[in-house]
């Protein structure tokens, strides 16, 4: 399977629409680090590097990519997403308390993905407040229920992007890495 045709999740500041432009500005590289990974949109659309590191401070988002990295877990996530109806009741059951209490990483990923895809606006993953349930699609013809129903088809493309995880402090200690983060860290 090729590159994903849409983001792993709808995420505020996700850069999905800008990713091709951003990738075009990148120099040739062997190491790529997403220090503030979010939806990983640039990582998912760029050519693979020898070493790729994804990191984000929010463990619920990182959990999605960890689940997708394991073939058996990714398949189970696909199955659960396919069985999840696009319903307001499901949207409303996804709260920060529920996510924090959920011990099953696959279920936590399913809940987070549903919230991201069914909320109005990309800020829907901010569980501190509700942006509302997305009923209508864009003027271009996309319909939220159809987007959710077909999202599991993208799992293999997202999974094949090859995401590795490192603590942020380890990322910044790579001697050959030049990034805004390393410039800030080393003044």
Regions found by a protein language model. Give the residues of each.
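An N-terminal domain-cap segment
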Residues: 3-49
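Conserved S-adenosyl-L-methionine
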Residues: 29-85
């Amino acid at each position: 399977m090729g590159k994903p045709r849409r983001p792993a999740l709808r995420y505020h500041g996700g850069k999905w629409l800008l990713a091709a432009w951003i990738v075009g500005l990148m120099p040739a590289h062997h190491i790529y680090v997403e220090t503030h990974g979010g939806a990983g949109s640039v990582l998912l659309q760029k050519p693979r590097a020898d070493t790729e590191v994804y990191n984000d401070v929010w463990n619920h988002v990182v959990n999605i990519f960890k689940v997708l990295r394991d073939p058996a877990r990714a398949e189970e996530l696909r199955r659960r997403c396919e069985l999840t109806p696009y319903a307001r009741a499901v949207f409303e059951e996804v709260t920060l308390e529920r996510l924090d209490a959920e011990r099953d990483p696959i279920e936590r990923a399913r809940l987070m993905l549903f919230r991201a895809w069914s909320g109005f606006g990309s800020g829907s993953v901010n569980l501190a407040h509700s942006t509302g349930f997305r009923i209508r699609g864009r003027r271009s013809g996309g319909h939220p229920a159809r987007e959710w129903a077909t999202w599991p088809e993208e799992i293999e493309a997202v999974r094949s992007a090859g995401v590795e995880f490192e603590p942020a402090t380890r990322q910044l200690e790579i001697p050959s890495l030049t990034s805004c983060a390393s410039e800030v860290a080393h003044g």
